[in-house]
Amino acid sequence: MTISPPERGEKAKGAAPTPYDQPVDRDHAPIDYEKLNKPGFWSSKLSKGPKTTTWIWNLHADAHDFDTHLGDLEETSRKIFSAHFGHLAVVFIWMSAAFFHGARFSNYTGWLADPTNVKPGAQVVWPVVGQEILNADLGGNYQGLQITSGIFQMWRAWGITSEVQLMALAIGGVIMAALMLHGGIYHYHKAAPKLEWFRKIEPMLQHHQIALIGLGSIAWAGHLIHIGAPVAALLDAIDAGNPLVVDGVSIASAADVTNLAPRLCDPAVASQIFPSLAGRTVENFFTLNWWAFTDILTNKGGLNPVTGSLWMTDISHHHLAFGVFAIFGGHMWRNNVHGVGHSMKEIMDVHKGDPILFPAPKGHQGIFEFLSNSWHGQLSINLAMVGSASIVVAHHMYALPPYPYIAIDYPTVLGLFTHHMWIGGLFICGAAAHAGIAMIRDYDPAVHIDNVLDRILKARDAIISHLNWVCMWLGFHSFGLYIHNDVMRALGRPKDMFSDTGIQLQPFLAQWVQNLQQSAVGTGDLVGAGNLPGSVLSEVFNGNVVEVGGKVAIAPIPLGTADLMIHHVHAFTIHVTLLILLKGVLYARSSRLIPDKAQLGFRFPCDGPGRGGTCQVSSWDHVFLGLFWMYNSLSVVIFHFSWKMQSDVWGLTGGNFAQSSITINGWLRDFLWAQSSQVLTSYGQPISMYGLMFLGAHFVWAFSLMFLFSGRGYWQELFESIIWAHNKLKVAPTIQPRALSITQGRAVGVAHFLLGGIATTWAFFHARLIGLG
């Protein structure tokens, strides 16, 4: 369904606009439970009830498409805002469940006492049908499922030392969930914000940057300074075999730390751990005597050798500094209270690009209005940014491990990397989806003439054709290197292979960056690194290996020909994903094939009957295809990461990555086949559930092919034969069975393809590293 921009946000034709005196409408929509009993109440067509089975699928597809319910931007905004509170309630319930499991069903205190030998567990399988074999002996007199979420390591970093504290957090999570649910009801039914409130961009930026991000970060820094870092110092001393003495008492166990915790905010106690907490902190702060805080706000760099993680005092310093920057940044914007500061609209309207490289005479004029009226446009940008940030987090989790002992919990490291990569990929595909919707529903060509958006659309053929050329070049060359190596190895000619011992293709730029980082320490060559100790950089760069409990926490990562080859496969798959997603956005409204595509909406299977060769051209179909290539891209990434870390950092596969990963056969034989031995031989062991999951997820993946490889007509013909048989037996249903629409079939197909593929990989990775112990 297409909603033309001029009508969006209008209440009634000819109605006078209400003055913006109050930001909310009181008692906007009384709670009507009768309406909720009627499925599809928001659609005149769906509210009539089902006549065919298509009804249930349309109900799923359109339930959250608020645009199509009323076409009123204010009402849509209110629904989204209310739904945010509901989402937060779900998050708090989820967090509460994690805390509750930690409090009642975990070996958290046992893990705290011996984090290098005891494995984390927070779930116990009930022997309903004899599946108690899944409860492994994880140490600390505990049998249960080994968890790989990293929550134990995170809780230790927070300063949690007992199950009582976890139970308190669980109760707090439920209370917060109730408050959030109440907030969602209140801000839709009792005090619903007006559209003008949602459009006030500068106050929103101030609230987010100053209050949520800035003050939130500083508040967290306060917790780390007064609780997290002192508890970490006490626990680190215990783990190092040299307990600290506080008030004449040796703090020799986590229980001792728990008993001391209520007094950690007492300056007389805290100053025995960090002298700068002796009680003059406020005075030192306001007299700018900030050097007094150098023991609690540090810049040590590197990793704590006891825990193999970043120093807690470095982390508290980071959060304090980041919070201050965010507060300063938030004050940049002009608001209703005073006329000082920047206006986002004024900044964008005067901003112009390079006249030669990007000739758009009107620059960014009209973009502010577009984004302040298009929630899909805003969501697209936010999804792209958060998705990219998630991918950055994935890489920081192993390069700069933030939580104590997380770096030596290899299943958790691999699991968190994979998790954040998938989340990032899905969010970026979502960004393309909502950009396409914004172009179709919210974009008015008459408003955007000769600005940057118009300029990009005019250059779309050049952009896509160049991107296509890049994809072809990368694809043929990167894959060609592997094919060459397979042929040479098959013919017994190793010296003619691209490898570190044959024809070298060294990633000299990446090696140069590594050497630059290492050689700059103690000099003025690297900004901020002048005269700093050698530990100020991550051990990945300065050549050190950090071992904790006999396991490698972090080590230099050597780069060679194998890395250059797989890196170009990454470039290829990512660029193809970009090509598909970007084409779906740039051609969302029109193309040479279908000039009136905007009238057909976001998702449509083909341009009607009688016009062949126009299928899979909708913006939705581009997201559909992009999801497959996103999956392809990230599969290569997580496989590369898994093998590289096992081979060159963790020492699990004897350093075979450099010579085995340079052929397709090597990936199949030495990675997929060799490393699947744990999951394939898992029966009769605690990891047997991963063996079952491995098989089940393969089935889910294969199930998707039934939807992807067949057309709707095949199924409709089959259904009609089955209905005929039911009619003969007089057991025909009153709701007429219909085959899934083409688009619905594709949606079911891609959902099962991704779910099956991700769960298969999940079982493969977990069984591998948990099985190795």
UniProtKB/Swiss-Prot annotation:
Transmembrane segment boundaries: 80-103, 166-189, 205-229, 315-333, 375-398, 414-440, 462-484, 564-582, 622-643, 687-709, 747-767
GO CC list: photosystem I; plasma membrane-derived thylakoid membrane
Cofactor mode of binding and number, as noted: PSI electron transfer chain: 5 divinyl chlorophyll a, 1 divinyl chlorophyll a', 2 phylloquinones and 3 4Fe-4S clusters. PSI core antenna: 90 divinyl chlorophyll a, 22 carotenoids, 3 phospholipids and 1 galactolipid. P700 is a divinyl chlorophyll a/divinyl chlorophyll a' dimer, A0 is one or more divinylchlorophyll a, A1 is one or both phylloquinones and FX is a shared 4Fe-4S iron-sulfur center.
Entry membrane topology: Multi-pass membrane protein
Coiled coil: none
UniProt enzyme class: oxidoreductase
UniProt EC number: 1.97.1.12
Cellular compartment(s): Cellular thylakoid membrane
Annotated residues for binding of divinylchlorophyll a': H698
Segment forming the signal sequence: none
Gene Ontology molecular functions: 4 iron, 4 sulfur cluster binding; chlorophyll binding; electron transfer activity; magnesium ion binding; oxidoreductase activity
Catalytic activity: reduced [plastocyanin] + hnu + oxidized [2Fe-2S]-[ferredoxin] = oxidized [plastocyanin] + reduced [2Fe-2S]-[ferredoxin]
Annotated spans, Disordered: 1-27
Top-rank lineage group of the source organism: Bacteria
Pfam family, one: PsaA_PsaB
UniProt function note: PsaA and PsaB bind P700, the primary electron donor of photosystem I (PSI), as well as the electron acceptors A0, A1 and FX. PSI is a plastocyanin/cytochrome c6-ferredoxin oxidoreductase, converting photonic excitation into a charge separation, which transfers an electron from the donor P700 chlorophyll pair to the spectroscopically characterized acceptors A0, A1, FX, FA and FB in turn. Oxidized P700 is reduced on the lumenal side of the thylakoid membrane by plastocyanin or cytochrome c6.
Record-given protein name: Photosystem I P700 chlorophyll a apoprotein A1
Organism whose genome encodes this protein: Prochlorococcus marinus (strain SARG / CCMP1375 / SS120)
Taxonomic lineage of the native organism: Bacteria, Bacillati, Cyanobacteriota, Cyanophyceae, Synechococcales
Gene this protein is translated from: psaA
